[in-house]
Amino acid sequence: MATDGASCEPDLSRAPEDAAGATAEAAKKEFDVDTLSKSELRMLLSVMEGELEARDLVIEALRARRKEVFIQERYGRFNLNDPFLALQRDYEAGAGDKEKKPVCTNPLSILEAVMAHCRKMQERMSAQLAAAESRQKKLEMEKLQLQALEQEHKKLAARLEEERGKNKQVVLMLVKECKQLSGRVIEEAQKLKDVMAKLEEEKKKTNELEEELSAEKQRSTEMEAQMEKQLSEFDTEREQLRAKLNREEAHTTDLKEEIDKMKKMIEQLKKGGDSKPSLSLPRKTKDRRLVSISVGTEGTVTRSVACQTDLVTESADHVKKLPLTMPVKPSTGSPLASANAKGSVCTSAAMARPSIDRQPSHGDLIGVSVPAFPPSSANRIEENGPSTDSTPDPTSSTPLLSSNAAPPTAQTPGITPQNSQAPPMHSLHSPCANASLHPGLNPRIQAARFRFQGNANDPDQNGNTTQSPPSRDVSPTSRDNLVAKQLARNTVTQALSRFTGPQAGAPPRPGAPPTGDVGTHPSVGRTSVKTHGVARVDRGNPPPIPPKKPGLSQTPSPPHPQLKVIIDSSRASNTGAKGDNKTVASPPSSLPQGNRVINEENLPKSSSPQLPPKPSIDLTVAPAGCAVSALATSQVGAWPAATPGLNQPACSDSSLVIPTTIAFCSSINPVSASSCRPGASDSLLVTASGWSPSLTPLLMSGGPAPLAGRPTLLQQAAAQGNVTLLSMLLNEEGLDINYSCEDGHSALYSAAKNGHTDCVRLLLSAEAQVNAADTNGFTPLCAAAAQGHFECVELLIAYDANINHAAGGGQTPLYLACKNGNKECIKLLLEAGTDRCVKTTDGWTPVHAAVDTGNVDSLKLLMYHRVPAHGNSFSEEESESGVFDLDGEEESPEGKSKPVVTADLINHANREGWTAAHIAAAKGFKNCLEILCRHGGLEPERRDKCNRTVHDVATDDCKHLLENLNALKIPLRISVGEIEPSDYGSDDFECENTICSLNIRKQTSWDDFSKAVNQALTNHFQAISSDGWWSLEDVTCNNTTDSNIGLSARSIRSITLGNVPWSVGESFAQSPWDFMMKNKAEHITVLLSGPQEGCLSSVTYASMIPLQMMQNYLRLVEQYHNVIFHGPEGSLQDYIVHQLALCLKHRQMAAGFSCEIVRAEVDSGFSKKQLLDLFISNACLIPVKQSPVKKKIIIILENLEKSSLSELLRDFLAPLENRSTESPCTFQKGNGMSECYYFHENCFLMGTIAKACLQGSDLLVQQHFRWVQLRWDGEPMQGLLQRFLRRKVVNKFRGQVPPPCDPVCKIVDWALSVWRQLNSCLARLGTPEALLGPKYFLSCPVVPGHAQVTVKWMSKLWNGVITPRVQEAILSRASVKRQPGFGQTTAKRHPSQGQQAVVKAALSILLNKAVLHGCPLPRAELEQHTADFKGGSFPLSIVSSFNSCSKKKGESGAWRKVNTSPRRKSGRFSLPTWNKPDLSTEGIKNKTLSQLNCNRNASLSKQKSVENDVSLTLNLDQRLSLGSDDEADLVKELQSMCSSKSESDISKIADSRDDLRMFNSPGNNPVFSATVNNLRMPVSQKEVCPLSSHQTTECSNSKSKTELGVSRVKSFLPVPRSKVTQCSQNTKSSSSSSNTRQIEINNNSKEENWNLHKNEHLEKANK
C-alpha cells in the first residue's frame, strides 16, 4: 500500500500541475479566442471536452481502485507505538468542530477544488462557445451582405465602364466637330479675307472710274466751252458784218437826207431871194432817239450809235436806220463805265424778232442790236444797269471778285418829235461794258455793293441751292458787314447816283470777266430755269444766241433823280393790246440781271406778286429753256415786242425816270417765268439787298406769278425782311403802308410774324397802325408772340401795342405765347403788365395754355414772375429776390416765394369743366402738376362736368404725386455716434448720412411709419452693399432683411423724431403727421448700436467692414488673448483694433469688471526694456508671489512693422502663450534685481503691422500669436472701398442712387479700379511692400458735375503717396542681389542710372495701366491734368542690351525674392489726412511711447535723398546700361506687364499717339546714346503706334534683314513724343493701331526683348 501510495504520489502531484497548465493554456487561448476561425474553435471544443471526460474517468478510477491507498496515506502513519501519532490522531478525531485543519494535506479537498475549478471552466467555455456561435452567425450575415455589395459594385462598375465608353464616343464626336468647326472658321476667315481683297479691288476700280469720269466731265466741259466760244466768235463776226451793213445803210440814208435838205435849201434860197434863212445843217444828235455805248476791256473798242430821223413813211415797208460806229479808246477812268457814257433812250417800243442767246468769248467786241423807234408823244427813259459775271477768268492769274459791280448811267430825257405810227424795228449791236469792281472805289459804292450782293449759296424758292465759284475777293464781301449795311441803308440814293458819275481810276486790268450779251427769248413752254454762276449752258438745250441789247444815250444825268419802280401787267395773248397810242414794253424773260424803269401809272396791277430769292438781285423772270446768261450786262431801251408790226400802248408821259437797280450778284438764281409768251413778262428790276425764300407760295407752283401793285410789294418786302426795298417804298408818296391783303395781313403784321425786327422798326417809324388786326382778329403783337419773336414783341410794346387785345377766339398775345412756349415773349408781356386772367371763348386761360403744352418754364413765369417796380429792371429784381428758377434745381426759389396768380385763376375751369390741374394730370405732365400743387389755393377735389376730380383723370405718376400732395418730406439720417475726428485715420468716416426722405401724409399711421422706416433702412443697407449701382426701387424686390454687411433694422439703437426719442412700434396719441407738424421735426435720426452697447453695428456702418467679420475678430481676441492684425499699409488695422478694444472694454464693464485700454506706438527706437516696463506698469506681467488681479487690461501695440518682432517679443513669447504661475519667466529690473513674472488671464494683447507678409526672423513669432491677415484682394478690404464710396455718393445725392451712366458713378468706379489695378500691378511686380490699403482712397471727393476735382485729388495721391512707395520698393527690389560693395543702403542712396530708368519705366507703366486707364474724363480734359502726375512721362528710351547668357540658368526665378529687412517707412510721404496725433480718448490711457530719435531722423534724411536722386532727370548725354541680372528680370517683368492680357490695356487709353512712342534702336552701337535732340519724324515715315498691351515685338538674334545691319527692335517703354530722343535714320516705325495683332519680325527667337540687344560687348561690360 505504501509502495503503491508512494508510487501514486507523483501522479497526485502532477494532477494539479496539469490542471494549472490547462488553466494557463485555456487562459492563453481565451485571450485569442476572438481571432480563431470556425474550424479552430471546433477543434478547441472537442479537445476540451475530451480532456474533461478523461479527467472524470481518472477521478472515478482513483476513487474506486485507490481507496486503500488514500486510507493508508491518511492513517497509515499512525501506529500505537508512537505517542505523537496517537496524539495527532486523537486530536483530529476528537475535534468536534469543522474549523480545525487537518495536520496533513487532504487530497480530497484538493480534488474537489480541482473539480470546482473545472466546472467553472466548463461554464465559461460553454459561454464562450455560445458567444462564438452568435459571432459566427453574425459573420455569416455580414459575408452575405458583403457578397451582395460586391455584386452591386460589379454592376455599377460595368455601368461606369459603359458610361465611360459612351462619354468617350461623345468626346470623340465633339473633338471631330470642333476640328470641323475650326476648319470652317479658317475657311470662312479665308473667304472673308478674299472678299475684303475683292472689295478693296472694287473700291480701287470704282475710284479709278470716278477719276476717269471726272476727267471726262472736265474734258466735255472744256469742249463745250470751246464750242460755245466758237459759236460766240461766229455770232460776233456775223453781227459785226450786220452792223457794218447797217452803218453803210445809215450813211447812205444820211447822205440822201443831206442831199434832200440841200435841195430844199437851194429851193428856199431861190424862193427867198434876199432873205437868208438861218437854218443850219441839222445834227444827228438832235434826232437821235437811242445811243448804245460799249466799252471793251481789250483791243479796239467800238461805240455803236443808233440814230433815228424824222422821216415819216406811209408805207408798210421796214425803214432801216443805219447806226454809226466809231472807235473809241479804252476808258482811262474806272473800268465800270466810260466817263461820257451818258445817253437818253426813246420811250417807244416795237417788236424785235426773237434770237437765241450765245455765250460770248472773252475779249470779243460784241455789237448789240438796237431797234429803231418812231417818235412818241412822251419822253421815256429805260435803262438797265450793267452787271458782270462772277466766274473767274481761267486765264487770269489774279483773284477776281466774287460779285462784281458796275454802276448804271442815268439819262435825261431826249426831246423827240412825235410820230403817229410805229415803224418796224430792226436791231443794232453794241458791245457790253465789261466791268469789274476796282479796289479803289468810293467807300459808299463799296458799301452798297456789300449790301446788295447776293449770297450764292442761299437756297432759291424751290429749295434748291445755286452754286457759285469760290470767292477770292481782295476786298471783304460779307453780307453781314455792319458798316456796309448801314451805309447802304442810309445812303441808297446817293450811292446809286454816284454810280452814274465818272470814276477815276486805273485802266482795266487783264483777266477781267468776259462780257455778256442779252437778247430776246424763243417761245418756250417751260416756266423756270436754274442757272449757275459758272457760265455754261445746259446740255440738251441749244446754246443761246447773244441777245439784242439797246445802248445808252449820251446825255448828262441829273444829280438826284426820282426813284421809280416798274410794274408790268401780264398779257393774255402773244400780241400786244392797243390803247391810247402808247406802247407797253414787254421785256423778254430771258434777260439777265439789269434794271428797267417804266412808269406804272397807266398799267393795270397784278394780283399775284412774286419775288425772287434772297441771294439774287435779279427780278427778271426767265422761262425754262432759255439759259439766263451768267454774264449780266446793262440794257437800256424799249423792250422788243413779240410780233412786229403791231402797235402797243406806249409808255405814259414821264419827264424824269432814273435807274433803280444795280446788280451785284455772283450767281443767277432761277426764278419762275411769268409767262411762256415772249411778250408777257412781268419781271421787275428793283434794288434789293436780299429776299427770303420762305414766302410767296405761288413761286412753288410753276405757273404765272405776276407781280402786283405797290402795297403788295410793300407787304412782300416786309415779309421777306428786305429793309432796303422797304425803305425805298416807304419814301414814296401816296403809298398806303396800312394796306391789308385779302386775309387782312398788313405789312407790319407780315414783318412781325416773320421776325424782321428792322422792318418792324421802319414800319412803326413810318406810323403804321400797330394794332391793325387781320380777318381773324390777330394783331402784329399776336403774330410776334405766337412765333416767339421777342425783339419784335418788345418793339411793338414800346410803340403802345395793345397787350391785352383778344382775337376772334379770345386769344391774347400772352395766351399765344404760352401756347407756343415762348418764355421770352411771356416775360416781356408780363413785365408790360398784361392781364393773366383773360379767357378765350372756350374758357381757356394762359395757365391752361401753358399746362396743355407741358411747358414748365412758361408755367413758372405765369405763376411766379412779378412785375418789376418802376425803375427796376427785371434782372435786378431777379438777382435780388431770386424769384424763379428755370433750371429746376433742388432748391428752386418758387418753393420759398409766393405765387403771383390767384387761386381763382388756378382753379378756373374751361368749357368742359377742366382746370389746369385736370389737363396736367390727364396728360401726365408731372412737373406742371407739381408746380400747380405748390399753389396753396389749388383745389384738387374740384370736379369737371363729368363729375371727375383731378385724381380720377390722372395718370399713375400724377396720382402718386396727388396722393403725396400734403405729405411732409422729412429726411431720414443714420448716425453712428461721435467719431474721434483724427484718431486712427477715421476722419473720412462721416457721423451722419442722409439715406432718403420719408413722405408722411395725414392718413399715415404709426404702424405704417414704422414699416416705412424699417423698409428705408433695409433698402439703404442693401443698396450700399450691393455689387452694382442699384436704385432703391431695385432693391425693394429683395425681401431679405439682412444686407451683405450684416446690418438690418435690428442694428438700431434708438430713433429720434426731431428731438423726441422714439422706438419702432411705439405709438403716440397724435398721428405722425400731426406729431411732426407740432414738434416741427425737420429730420429723423437713426442711431446705430456701437461699442458702448457692446455691439459693432455702428463700426460696420462707419467702416463698411461686414458685421460678421468684426464679430469674428472680437471672438478671436476674447478666445486667444494675443491677436495681431497685419496687412498692407492703409488697411485700417489701427481703426479695427481700436474699435474692438472699445467694444471689449464695454462688454467687460457690463459684466462687472473694470477695464482699461493702453495704447503704445512702436517705432524703430522702441526697446524691449520699454515694452517690459509697459507690461509691468499696467499689471499685465505680475510677480509670481502676487495674487492675480481682477482688472482687465487691453494692450494695443501699433506699428510693429517698424521694429523687429523677434527681438522685441522673443522673451515674452513663452509666458504669453502659457499664462499661469507654472510657467513664469525671469526678467531683470532696472535696479539689477531679477524676479519671476507671469501673464495673467485678464490681459489682452493686440498689435498692428502695416506689412503684407512676414519675412525672415519675424516668422519665428508667428506661431505664438493668432494672426488676422487683411489682404487687399480678399474681404473685408476687397469690397470695403466700393461700399464706402457708394455710401458717400448716396449721401451726396440726398439718399438717391444715381444711375450707372451718371458721371459721378463713372468717376467713383474709376477711383475704385485705380486702387485695384495699382495693387494688381504691384503684386505682379513682386513688390508687396508697395501695396496700398483702401484707407488712402476713402478721401476720394465726390462732387457732382466736377469730375476734374477727383482727378486732381488722384494726382496729389499719386505724387504724395504712391510714387515714393513705388520708387522705394523698386529700388529695394533691384538691389536685393547686389554685390557686397553695393549694398542695399548704398543702392538706395545712390541708385544707378539703370535703376533710375527702371523706376521711371515702372512709374510710367503703372500710371498708364492703373491710373489713367479708364478715366471717364474726355481726352482733352485728361491731357490737361496728365502733367500733374509725376513720373508719367518716360524721358529716355532705355536702350541697353540684356543677354540671356549673362544670367545663370538657376537664377530665372530668383528675382521674385523680396527684401527681408524691415522697411523703414518715413512719415514724409503720408498725407496730412492720415497723421495720428496723440489725442487721449475717453477711458483710454494714452501711453504713447514713440520716440523721435536719431534713427528716425536718419531715416527721414535717407528717404529724402532717395526721392531727390530718383526725381533728378538723367543726364541725356550719358550712355545707359542696365547692368545687373535683377534689373534684367525687372525689365522683363515690366515687359510682361505691358503685354499682359489679364491686366488693363494701355492702348485703351484715349489715342495715346501724342503721349507714347515706341522706339527702334540701332544694333551697331554697343550702348545706345540718348541725345537731347527733339525727334521730328518726317512726313514720309509712318506714324508710330502707341504702346499696346496686345503688341509684342519679337526680334531675331540670328538674322537681320535691314540693310545696314540694324536690328529692328521695338521698345516697350512708353516714351512721350515731346521728350523722345533722336533715333537712327535707318530705323523705321511701323504704323499700327492699338488693337493690331502681334508684329512678328524675323520670329526666330521665342524670347521677347524689351528694347534689348544681345550684344557680347555689353555682356562683357556688365560682367
Swiss-Prot record:
User: Where does the record place Acidic residues bias?
Assistant: 875-892
Q: What residue spans do the ANK repeats cover?
A: 709-739, 743-772, 776-805, 809-838, 842-871, 912-942
Q: Where is the composition biased (Polar residues)?
A: 404-422, 583-593, 1619-1628, 1635-1644
> Where is the PTM Phosphoserine found along the chain?
S1524
The coiled-coil regions, if any, are 119-275
For the region Disordered, give the residue spans.
Answer: 1-26, 355-440, 454-478, 499-614, 872-897, 1446-1482, 1617-1663
Keyword Metal-binding on entry: no
Q: What does this protein do?
A: Regulates the dendritic spine distribution of CTTN/cortactin in hippocampal neurons, and thus controls dendritic spinogenesis and dendritic spine maintenance. Associates with the striatin-interacting phosphatase and kinase (STRIPAK) core complex to regulate dendritic spine distribution of the STRIPAK complex in hippocampal neurons.
Could you tell me what this protein is called?
A: Cortactin-binding protein 2
